[in-house]
């Protein structure tokens, strides 16, 4: 992890000395953690603003469409940050891989391939694709192990068949996988919702929690899968924040 600055340890003072606790400088937050905090806080604010009411999630410019929500909270925060390897390159988040390029898998399990040199600060931390050569149980075991890789700040992209529908969904994990409860916590928009006069309205969620088996059962289906995208460790503060790129 690339820290902005780290406090030096008080090597010569006993750990139980009260004076040491008062004098020891605090460890400053890393730029990467600050970026993740900003993304999560922006999502929380949108959740609070929605106040439990469904938000329009129908049109390309609606930020409450699931993918748009995750892109929006990224763009609201990314101008302040860069990658140490490419300090002059503004950060960008890739679009989903087009349907034709997903074949033989179903649309929605992954993003387009955009290099770090082009501004993509994410890498694939884990990926699951249903393997028809294995049994359903074997696939489920792999899907569960995949879900155990979740860490705070991860972007989660899946192609699913589950209670809320069939197709692509995007979410952001707001905590590490919890092995004690076998759960993950996330935020998203439009996983649940309804249509009103032909227009889709979606629910904004923050600190939603489910056992990993719930998620695995959603995407552990033939042709489907999911990918965990994680911010690189070399996130730094930008020396001169650039204006955000306009929406396509």
Predicted regions, residues:
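Alpha-helix termini
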Residues: 80-83, 178-182, 217-227
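Boundary at the C-terminal end of the N-terminal hydrophobic targeting segment
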Residues: 5-7
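N-terminal capping segments
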Residues: 12-120
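Low-complexity, Gly/Ser/Thr/Pro-rich intrinsically disordered linker/tail segments
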Residues: 188-192, 198-248
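A detector of low-complexity, intrinsically disordered, Ser/Thr/Gly/Pro/Ala-rich segments
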Residues: 9-11, 181
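...with weaker cross-activation on analogous glycine-rich loops/strands in unrelated enzymes
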Residues: 91-195
């Amino acid at each position: 992890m690339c820290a902005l600055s780290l406090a030096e340890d008080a090597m010569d003072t006993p750990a139980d000395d009260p004076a040491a606790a008062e004098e020891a400088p605090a460890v400053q937050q890393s730029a990467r953690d600050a970026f993740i905090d900003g993304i999560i806080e922006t999502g929380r604010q949108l959740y609070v603003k929605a106040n439990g009411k469904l938000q329009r999630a129908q049109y390309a410019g609606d930020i409450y469409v699931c993918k748009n929500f995750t892109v929006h909270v990224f763009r609201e925060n990314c101008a302040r940050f860069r990658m140490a390897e490419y300090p002059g390159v503004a950060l960008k988040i890739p679009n989903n891989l087009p349907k034709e390029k997903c074949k033989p898998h179903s649309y929605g399990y992954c993003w387009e391939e955009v290099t770090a040199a082009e501004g993509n600060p994410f890498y694939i931390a884990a990926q699951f694709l249903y393997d028809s050569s294995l049994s359903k149980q074997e696939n489920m075991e792999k899907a569960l192990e995949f879900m155990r890789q979740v860490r705070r700040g991860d972007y989660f992209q899946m192609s699913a068949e589950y209670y809320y529908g069939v197709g692509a969904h995007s979410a952001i994990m707001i905590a590490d996988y919890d092995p004690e409860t076998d759960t993950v916590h996330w935020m998203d928009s439009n996983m649940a919702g309804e249509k009103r006069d032909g227009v889709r309205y979606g629910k904004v969620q923050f600190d939603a929690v489910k056992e990993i088996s719930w998620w695995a059962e959603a995407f552990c289906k033939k042709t489907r899968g999911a990918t965990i995208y994680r911010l690189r460790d070399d996130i730094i503060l930008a020396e001169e924040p650039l204006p955000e790129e306009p929406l396509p």
